Design a protein with these regions (language model features):
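Extended, low-complexity segments enriched in Ser/Thr/Gly and acidic residues that occur primarily
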Residues: 1-116, 132, 141-150, 156, ...
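Long hydrophobic alpha-helices with heptad-repeat/coiled-coil character
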Residues: 2, 49-54, 161-183
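Short, well-ordered helical secondary-structure segments
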Residues: 66-69, 165, 171-173, 189
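A surface/secretory-pathway sequence property marking extracellular, secreted
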Residues: 113-121, 125
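Extended, solvent-exposed segments with strong compositional bias
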Residues: 122-176
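Ser/Thr/Pro-rich, low-complexity mucin-like regions
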Residues: 170-207
């Protein structure tokens, strides 16, 4: 006969939470001590956003979509995943489209915050700024570091759906952190083609505390 019980203890001197597992196996007690995984973050919400599908641009460095953690924000953002979806409606010239870290954001069209999906409706409202670029109202940013990129499809009817995943497989937390005043954008790396249709899907968490996962 085997009986298993759990004893929860307060954090030890190092601050780690300890759980003692007691097993009764054929009349013999066996004790196992395990550490419970904790995080230095206070999670405020996990969010999902799917952009409009916008037409391609012939302009090099044209920015289609951007998201920014406001400069006065008291939260951090952690990117979980980015999905790029690009369709070629006619024969088109292939180019690279990339995602970059940015440290400023102006221009473009503001996206209504109600279009951001809370993964749990009980989460707090998100604080991010999201904008879409157009030829008449282009987005301007300060480009910092290239995060990822892909080549566009060539033939009519071809499409690309590619996911860049930054989440930890165990707890789905990400260590790709965007502090106040930081964000990401999606842009042409060369002169593009109007026969592309482009959207992105982003998932992120907003939290208080430090970004390191322990």
């Amino acid at each position: 006969m085997s009986v298993e019980g759990y004893i929860g203890l307060p954090p030890d001197s190092s601050g780690k939470r300890v759980r003692t597992i007691v097993k009764q196996i054929e009349g013999e007690s066996r004790h196992h001590e395990v550490f419970c995984i904790t995080s230095p973050r206070t999670l405020l919400g996990v969010y999902h956003y799917c952009s409009s599908m916008v037409s391609g641009s012939t302009s090099a460095d044209f920015i289609y979509h951007a998201i920014l953690n406001p400069s006065d924000s008291d939260r951090n953002m952690a990117l979980r995943r980015i999905i790029l979806h690009i369709v070629s409606v006619k024969q088109a010239t292939p180019i690279e489209i990339a995602v970059w870290r940015i440290t400023s954001l102006s221009g473009g069209v503001d996206v209504d915050p109600s279009r951001i999906c809370k993964k749990d409706t009980n989460y707090a409202d998100p604080i991010v700024i999201i904008r879409e670029g157009s030829e008449t109202n282009p987005i301007s940013t300060t480009i910092e570091n290239k995060i990822c990129g892909t080549m566009t499809p060539i033939n009519a009817g071809q499409y690309l759906w590619i996911e860049f995943n930054f989440a930890n497989a165990v707890d789905q937390r990400s260590d790709f952190i965007l502090h106040a005043g930081e964000g990401i954008c999606m842009r042409n790396e060369q002169a593009g083609d109007v026969d592309f249709r482009i959207l992105w899907i982003i998932e992120w968490e907003e939290f208080k505390g430090i970004g390191v996962i322990t």
